[in-house]
Curated annotation (Swiss-Prot):
This is Orotidine 5'-phosphate decarboxylase. The lineage of its organism: Eukaryota, Fungi, Dikarya, Ascomycota, Saccharomycotina. It comes from Cyberlindnera fabianii (Yeast). Belongs to the OMP decarboxylase family. GO terms for cellular component: cytosol. The keyword Acyltransferase does not apply.
Amino acid sequence: MVTTLSYTQRAEAHPSPLAKRLFTVMEQKKSNLCASIDVKTTDEFLSLVDTLGPYICLVKTHIDIIDDFSFEGTIVPLKKLAEKHNFLIFEDRKFADIGKTVKNQYASGVFKIAQWSDITNAHGVTGAGIVKGLKEAAQETTDEPRGLLMLAELSSKGSLATGEYTKQTVDIAKTDKDFVIGFIAQRDMGGHDEGFDWLIMTPGVGLDDKGDGLGQQYRGVDEVVAGGSDIIIVGRGLFGKGRDPAVEGERYRSAGWNAYLKRCQ
């Protein structure tokens, strides 16, 4: 059963400080839009973040794509833009190893993701230890709230994240109520009758294109929000093919918000 509660109502009752903060930002900005910004230079990345910042609740990064990445040159300015425009940061790392390994990958190395990314995500393929390892890394790295999304479903053609795999990933999410805040999924993942209020973030959302020739399949905004998505993840629809990111940012923000208001009625 898809929830009809408002983001404000969900913020008030949610056990996760990070989810509370995200719901609050969404309500303040009247936005359930996450911008997925996959570009190869820091300058282009920061420019797009600054332009799209007013329209989004969340920016999604693949930080290892950036050729000239540096903590001081890329992350410090990104954090300043997050403060300026009031959005959160989601590093789409898709962790998929045993607990001890992901703990080090999350906290250490070149990217030090746990230091700056409010949200990250993980596959369920290695079992519940992945949640424990990532949570320990977050707690040992920062006093700021952090949240984890489990990858329950993907938007790519032929994805193996279906059926029993999806069900077991949901079971892994149930092992931690305050750190696991939700799923990357195409629909509502249930759990309401057991006291869970999971955020559903959905990639592969487009107002124009139906696919990209490389397996991505796009679905409409109204369809995914009506089906239980709380946050729509949009990438090339915002800035690809010569699009104006400010125009598209407002277009997708408005479409996403109106779809949410319809769901709440």
